[in-house]
Every structure is written in structure tokens, then in C-alpha cells.
Amino acid sequence: INGGLLFGLNMAGISGAVDMIKGEFSLTDSGLGTVAALLTFGCLIGALFTGTFTEKFGRKKVMIITAVLYIISAFGCALAESATMLVVFRVLSGLAVGATSVVAPMYISEIAPAHSRGRLVSLNQFAITIGIVLAYIFDYLLIGFGYNAWRYMLAVPGFFGVLFLLFLIVKFPESPRWLLAHARRDEAVKVLNSIGGNALVTEELPAMESTLIAEQKKDK
């Protein structure tokens, strides 16, 4: 859910800041459009390569990296002293958004019990919408902070990123499916047991193992 909120906050957070950014860096309309649109370019790159990284390093590690990118990009945008700096951090923000669009649904589908999987994936999508709404609310509340209000607007996702990172480190286990795929069965059992007890282990583990075996045969 945190990932969805950050997705929405980063997509919409700049909307209330565009006029101030244009004045701050004396941008033309096309230059301002480039600054705003480059987040989408970062999204494309992030979405393209995240799948490979999640298979190699694990879902949790990629989400931690994504949370760090959210923090760096948000505070980097807020502290930008030039349009070039702003562009660089906007692209980083896009990388995080693109990565989240891939890894968050993947993680939820692999760790949630079957009976609640669809609901949780839908909740992640709903969180994106909530993030967009929150971005507009924060922009409205911060508009009165004067000349540097745009910096505060762009910093907002950074604070949510810190919370996301703390939750990831403390609360979120690795995907049991990824653990199984990397010959770490005992750890996968522990994760499933911590989520739903022995009943979930009995229900999910055989299905995961049979799916992985089928995929390995297909790859051959």
C-alpha cells in the first residue's frame, strides 16, 4: 500500500508546483514540459528492467532500493539548484515509480493467501489513486508557504519513502516463491508460517513448488 501511495504522490505531486518551477528556473513551456514528462521516461526504464532484478536479487531487496530511490529523488528535487538537477532527480523518481508498478503487484500476489490475493492487489491500485488525491491535498496546503512552496511539495514523497523503507526493513519478509526458486525452502516455510500458520504452509507450498517445477521444465 505504501508503494501505491508513493506511486500516486510522485505522479501528481508536481502539478501544483509547475508555475513556480517555471519561474524559478526561467523555463520555456517546452522546457517545463520536459521536466514534467521525464518522470515517464524513468518509469519506462524502471518497468523494463525491474523484472530481471527481482528474479536475481529478490522482491524485498528491490523494494528497499525503490524506497531509497523515492527518498533520494524527492529530496533531490526539493533541493535542486538548477533545471538540470531537477531533471536528473525526476528521472530517478520515474525509475522508482516504474519499478513499483512491477514489483508491488508481484510481491503481493506471491505473499498473500489465495483468498485475499485479489483484494490486496486491488487495494494496491486503490492506494495509487489515494496517493494522487493526497498529492493534490498537500499541494493545496503548501501553496501558501511562499516562494519555495514548490520545494516542499516535491519533498512530500520523501517522507512517505522513509516510512516505506522502515516498514520494509522491519515488517516485510521476502517472497516465499522467490525463496523456493532459489533453493531456500526452509526460509519459505518460515515466511508462510508467519503469515498464516501451518494451514497456509500446507495450502500454498505444494502449489508453489509444482508451479516452479512446471516453469523450469518449460524453460528447458
Range-by-range predicted roles:
Residues 1-220:
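Transmembrane-helix signature of 12-pass secondary carriers
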